[in-house]
Amino acid sequence: MSNFLKPNTLHVDSLSPRHRSLSSGLSSGLSSACSSGSVSPVPIIPIIAISRIRDGDESESESEIELEPARIFHRRMSINNSGNNKRSTNLASIIKEGYLLKHTWSFQRWRRRYFRLKRNHLYYAKDAKCDVFDEIDLSELCYFECSIKNVNHSFQIITPTRSVVLCADSRRDMEDWLGSLKAATAPQRPRGDSILIDQHDILSNHHHWYATSHARPTYCNVCRDALSGVTSHGLSCEVCKCKVHKRCAAKAIANCKWTTLATVGKDIIEQPDGSIIMPHQWMEGNLPVSSICAVCKKTCGSVLRLQDWRCLWCRDTVHVACRPQMAIACPIGPAKLSVVPPTSVHSISTDDAWDVASPKGNFSPLLVFVNSKSGDNQGVKFLRRFKQLLNPAQVFDLISTGPSLGLRLFRHFEMFRILVCSGDGSVGWVLSEIDRFNMHKQCQVAVMPLGTGNDLARVLGWGSSCDDDTHLPQILERYESASTKMLDRWSIMVFEKAISVPKIPKMSITTEQEAVLTGMVTAANQHLRLIVETNDTQTLISSTRNLCDTIDDLVSRIFEHHKDDEQLAVKCDILKQKLTMLLDALQEEEIGAHSGDDLIATIRSLIARSVPSTNSARPSLLNPNISIEKTEKDHINLKERRSSRSLRSSEKEALQCRANSVKRAIYNVVEHSEPGRPKRYQRKLSITPFEALKIPTNSGESTPCSSPLPIIPPINIISPTMETSRLTCISPLPDTRRDSVDENFFNSINLPAPRQFADSRRSSGVPEVIQELEEGANGETIYRIGRLSLSGGANIDDAGNRLSPVSDGGDNSPIDRKLDFLRVPIITSDSIVDPLSDYRPIEVFERTYYMARELDKDKDKERKQDVVLDGEKEEDAGVNEKCEEQTLHPQNTLVHTCNLQVPGIVVTPQSQNVYTSDSITIIDTDQQSNTLQEQSSSEELGCDASDVLSAISNEECSVASEIFDKAETGHTLGDIIQNLDASNFTHIDSPETSDETEAMPGESLMDDISSVLGHDITNALQDNTITDDTTTLCSEHMGPPKPPRKKSMSALSKSQIHPRRRNSSPPRMARLARMDSDDNPQQFGFENIVFEIDNRCDDQKMREPPRYCSLAQFVEGNDIARQSFKQLMLECNSNNNSNNNSNSNSNNNNHNDGNSNDEPETPTNTVITLAHSQLTTTSTSDELDELSTQTAIKIEIHDADSSTMCTTTATTKPLESAMASSTSPTKRSGLGQDISVVVRPPTPLRGDSIKPTPSSSSILSSSLLGVRSLNSSEIRRHSSHAPSLAVREYDKDKDRRHSGFNPNYLALDPEHARFLSSSPAASRRISCGSLFKKNQKYYTKRTYGLFRVRFFVVAEPDIRLATLALIRPLIPLPNEALPNLQTLKGSKSSLFMGSTLFGFEHFSDKEERQGKDKERTPPEETSRKMPIINPIVRLPNWPNLANGTGFISKCLLANADTLCAAVSPLMDPDETLLAGYHEKCVMNNYFGIGIDAKISLDFHNKREEHPEKCRSRARNYMWYGVLGSKQLLQKTCKNLEQRVQLECDGQRIPLPELQGIVILNIPSFMGGTNFWGSSTKKDDIFLPPSFDDRVLEVVAVFGSVQMAASRLINLQHHRIAQCQSVQINILGDEEIPIQVDGEAWLQPPGMIRILHKNRVQMLCRNRSLEVSLKSWQEKQRQHSISIQRDASSTASEHAVSTDDVISERECYVLLNFIEAVSSLVKWVKFLIISHPALQHDLYEVACRASEALESIHPQGKLLEGPSLRTKLVEVIDSSRQLYDDACTLLRDRGHSLILREDLETKLSAALANMEMELKKCSVQKCIDGKLRAYFNVLAPNEESDGRRKSRPFWVRLRSGSTAGQQQFKPPMTNTREAANNWSVNEVVTWLETMQLSEYVDSFLKNDIRGKELLTLGRRDLKDLGVVKVGHVKRILQAIKDLSEN
């Protein structure tokens, strides 16, 4: 038998071409014979037997027993005898392969077979190693989904010769195979894109079969025979319901439901005007039960044969005989509003979107996405049902095509709706794709609940489930009447320690161009890494050569496809330029240029070589007088430093910066080349994400300053990789990146750091030439060039000697350049080469190019300004010389120098605003003068040289920081730029903490502080005082401390002849004296100087204190250890110097004496008084009186170590007396020590959000910021912390400080900037008022806590706010100490105008804020500020509280705002950037971490492992219950509070013992649980939850029992807060489960930030509108029934009478018509007779109408019979002409007519009656061709004419009030402009024309004019007495028509 079978096994590959064609021809011939069904069964029987003997499982079965006569010609393919090359070719052409179950004939079994799919062929064998495969020809393929023996993933393949049933492991696999079969049989196209395949499937018009059974006899639409079997089993098209046999499926023609105009084909009907009519699409037979013919209204359809027709669109059924009488146009059906007619979709344009022509009438297309897996695979039913109701091209399966195809096709629709039929996860998928296509404004999204949870559908009102598809048309009507609401969407930003490389999808289709670009980018990255890391010369040379070749090839390939893109050409040029810079740097390094020369020389040589040598060299961008010289001392210092290892590191850093710059340029070029598909490009480049190159160093070489400024890549491509070390504390402010040296943690991970925590050494790569900018007296900018020491910052000349203060005017004085304020020039024409031009980013060149032409103009003005400035400096020199004698301790030290151009810093010879005594220093930074020349530099600076600093902060900077081995010794007073936030209570590594300080006992002080303030307040103190250590950068050799510098208080009384400008730099004497100081912040390295400069290029930076970097001691579970804090030793002289104010000083001395005599051992009081006055004698006495009587603050600071009292006052007598009478010595016993006030300034706002206030009062009210206890009790009098305080008149658009942009910070994208500007800052504000009253002067005295800080307030409201600003961040005040802030919003010159401390809405005008407020916050939120924190959260026994009815609970609720606002600030959104973060996903519903996410993750894993167990919603709920009970026992998320940290709007929330945290955007969680509690009850603390208020609700989860109980009862004790941003820090090494909208995963340690992303329009169910529409439709139906009844009665009357007899009703209307015509004819004739000047044509028309009227009642009797209707036509025509001519005459000549009053009244009434009667008449053309007149008998009868005659008609024709000036208009003027000018009478006439005269009295009584008419609403009409729904709708519709027209 085996020998007999061998000839039947055809080895196709071994046959010759001739035999191969013969075999195929034989097979095709027999195939055609088989398809005809006429093959005799005689030869088949032995063949079947042979087949069974040959292979027992080769006989397939079907539901119908059908024989396969072509079985003998089954082809088999051998794959081994063709050679390896042939086999590789065959494998390459495989589309899909894998194992499937094949249904066999014997015993209905399933056998596992290996299948291979190629083009038009399918092969299968037992396994992949078989040599021979069976072949199935797919040339005429029919495939469909089926279900056999309860197998839900089976599908059947039918060809003319084979019928095979296959089964996949899952539905996804089945759909993959079906999609592959579709691709294998689709015609080949030049672009093998999946989009084209999907589009072809839409446009092909093919049927989509599935196997089904039928309860009624059903007939095949191909062969017209009945389907076999009792159940009529066969195939049905899921779209058009075409029925066929399985054997006939391949023969069915492609006439499925139309999708586009092309598929309509020859059935297109075009009207004469060119418009296309939608025709009917008929399907024959198989009509539903009880179908009624649309023409004859009789039953149609049959169960005996295939007959009658059914339209696929309007679903009308019709008989074969009645079909010609059917209307041509198809009404489309009940879902007409949602359907996209195929006649409107003309084609698919080049951007893969439909070219759409909107149809006439109402049109709101609906795009439907269905998840076929949702709802126990119920989505398949809804998918088919939607395709039957709508255009099949509107419905997409999310599993097969995803949302992108549908959104792309609908892109050209101006407005459309989206219906997502799935769960919450699929809704998020669709919304993410909407984000990607940026279609938020085009679409409105609705949800149909088919998933398990369906939380979003619940909230939107669509219910919790939808399982029945039979009522889908009614459901669509609900979605058509839905209302729109905005849904907030939140970005889940994640910063992880290790981010894995994303996997490439299995079925990803990549183009050749993308693959080539990816390979080139990868190769370039490898070459760059080798260049930076290698030490081998040959490797370096080869890598460099390969890099150049790769970049050249990359640029050429990209540029040839984008030849016209100018921006791409610029980016390519930048890439080539940066590559040239890298090569130059390599060349200099290799030839040894660094061996004996400084890096500046290298830069100079590089630039000199790159700049073309021309006569006019390129001008300098900074200064034309820069000179780079070397001295012998410089060379000595160079040789000393060359021996250190840091120099090599610096060279490596320079090279690394160059390499990173090239790498960034490559990514910019490639990103720009593919703007259309950014997501695909990101996926392709994900294998080589942008990552800054790092220099490999060992542990010995890793110094704190060894890394340059980090390059922060774009968020969308960053992929940092870090080691997984223990994460014990995470800095909450991801502002910049820092490199730290902690062995356990910070060496292995780079984390974002806040600005106050940021490492100053990050700015080590700084250009060494920095320019000083100073302002002239009249608003000009002056450039100064000074030599600054790299060690201490002193001024040094070229020879290395320090400059004296009087050297400004000498030969060594810097050359001053003045710049016009408006022009801000940067570039000069001098032939000086800028040494930093190549190191400055291209953006700086672009930004300053157009500023370069005006530098050398106005030379005379510059010289005059120099003379004025020099005179000023000479007068200041004397004071500086005196200071120098007292404080300067020069030392001959070798100092490396270079030219430094410091932007925004002016080094002046004298600081006249610094006043020093033995124990206190007062610094006045806001001295004002009456002279016109005085202006603040922070307010006049037109260009703050941010361009220079942008170069510093850019990766282009490669100059390393210089750190000296020798340190200066000495201890003097700190320079004036001091830390405002620091106090005696400072960090152990802070620069303020010198070696003289004594360490506090670790437990005593901190325990006391923690016990009083709590953990969070202690954290606030830590955050306010932590600075970063720079002592590690210094030498270990320290000199002996020196006593502090002294300055006489007599400086207070000295007059200032010339005003001094406020500077951002300390006075020169302070710098020189500070150089030898031990606590000098500048001695720790040049990088700290530049870091200070870098952070102070604008006004905000000038006000902010310097932050030097250090490492604190950390302990697990806390931010910082207690050992990291010390107590500064205050040094106060026992002698009190005399003050200018004798009375105040004497009073204070009395207190001091009392303290020192009575209690020598008790702490003394340090009384500091600040007043809003100038501490000079230049101010007039009037000004002093005015200032001193308004405001003052007195603060007592107790210090245990100080032995005397230090006092400074500047107030007048009324204030002094008040202070003296209220101040008394405070006695205290014990050993405790008082801590001085640590001032936390308010968070600054962006400058452009504050309106400048030129008011003079701003000068007075903005001069106080804070008080600080310095090393010598230094007090700074400062204007403000906010950039815009006391802003004077200037053009703020020309000052970049007020644009909110700072080039030195990391890039702040516009979207994030808008978020920061719209959301309240995370300031410590008080949201509710208290007991202070407006404008009430009184005096308060309070002592709070352990600090014993006393605040004396004698002031107006502004100074009370100032007091609160000082104490607000530290002390939780009771309500009585807080003023009523809502009453203080009137003062625009308030001290806190630019601050967000109290949320005063920035004191801007209401008109400017109105639009933003409406978009940003709802009205309820105006009185409450975020975050709103539950006051019970900080109770130690939370959540184990009572019912909340006790006294403590009531007190907590009463002081909720005060307690909530006192939480320690940890994160300020205004200062936070997202560098290092990437968007993990987007949250729409809720976010969970802990137990809830663990349950969701376990359920997800269970569903993946056993999908058959999770196919129904009931089973899924059961599994959730089981898994929740499991967590009740296991408690895997126990002690979650130890593993995570929670921050709400920057405020740390103390967490109790809990197992999870849930963040809600909607009030529904995990299947309907209301975790937040009842939202209907009014809450005194929280806002009602809503999904459109941009507010999140944070809830604690204590266990699975609480989760279960929340489904039944409303729990509220677990509420944490309401806020606008959330940050969660995950500590430790373990991953924590996290879920977003039900999708769970394990999140590694790191930081998670939840920020507002955008808003999307969602459709919510509107039940009230549904009820109204339903009632209206019912009335319309009743009305149509009555009309039909009347029409039938009229028809019966017509049938009874052979002639058209006038009915009784029509006769009544006819008599009224005759009366109206007669009256009009009469009064028109009288008008013409009375005014002979008028035209006589009107009289002829009146006579003609009168004659026609007489013809219908000759001799006083009406005509009878059909002649009456014919005669009436003439009467109607003549009367209408008379009416029109009369109105035209009155309109044209009315202004000159003077009519009698009675004639005017009667004529107007006649015209009005005629108009109403003409509306009741109609003329119709009958079958015989004659015209006949008919009357509308259903129109309501009018009231008597008396009322109408009392109101003249043509009042509505006039626009004026006087008759002589009236201008007539048409009777019915429907334009909005005309209606707006209507009078009451015209409105009444308008009502009468609508036959609503019963409301005339009401409109007259309420004086409703046209303007009021256009604004009437439903409620207004109800008040006017219009209660009938029909009348209300008619009036509203008419008003709408008036408005639209």
Curated annotation (Swiss-Prot):
Q: Any idea where the PH domain is?
A: 93-186
What sequence ranges are listed for the domain DAGKc?
Answer: 361-497
**Annotated EC:** 2.7.1.107
> Where is region (Disordered) located?
1030-1068, 1132-1164, 1215-1257, 1276-1295
Gene Ontology molecular function terms on file: ATP binding; ATP-dependent diacylglycerol kinase activity; zinc ion binding
Q: Which UniProt keywords apply?
A: ATP-binding, Cytoplasm, Kinase, Metal-binding, Nucleotide-binding, Phosphoprotein, Repeat, Transferase, Zinc, Zinc-finger
- SMART domains noted in UniProt: C1, DAGKa, DAGKc, PH, SAM
Q: Could you tell me where the Low complexity compositional bias lies? A: 1133-1155
Major place of residence:
cytoplasm
What is the official name of this protein in its record?
Diacylglycerol kinase eta
Please describe what this protein does.
Answer: Phosphorylates diacylglycerol (DAG) to generate phosphatidic acid (PA).
What's an example GO cellular component term for this entry? cytoplasm
Query: Boundaries of each SAM domain copy?
Result: 1878-1941
Q: InterPro entries of this UniProt entry?
A: ATP-NAD_kinase_N (IPR017438), C1-like_sf (IPR046349), DGK (IPR037607), DGKD_4H (IPR054474), Diacylglycerol_kin_accessory (IPR000756), Diacylglycerol_kinase_cat_dom (IPR001206), NAD/diacylglycerol_kinase_sf (IPR016064), PE/DAG-bd (IPR002219)
- Species whose genome carries this gene: Drosophila grimshawi (Hawaiian fruit fly)
A GO biological process held by the record: glycerolipid metabolic process
Highest taxon in the source lineage? Eukaryota
Q: What family does the entry list?
A: Belongs to the eukaryotic diacylglycerol kinase family.
Zinc finger residue extent: Phorbol-ester/DAG-type: 206-256, 279-330
Its annotated compartments are:
Cytoplasm
Reaction equations catalysed: a 1,2-diacyl-sn-glycerol + ATP = a 1,2-diacyl-sn-glycero-3-phosphate + ADP + H(+)
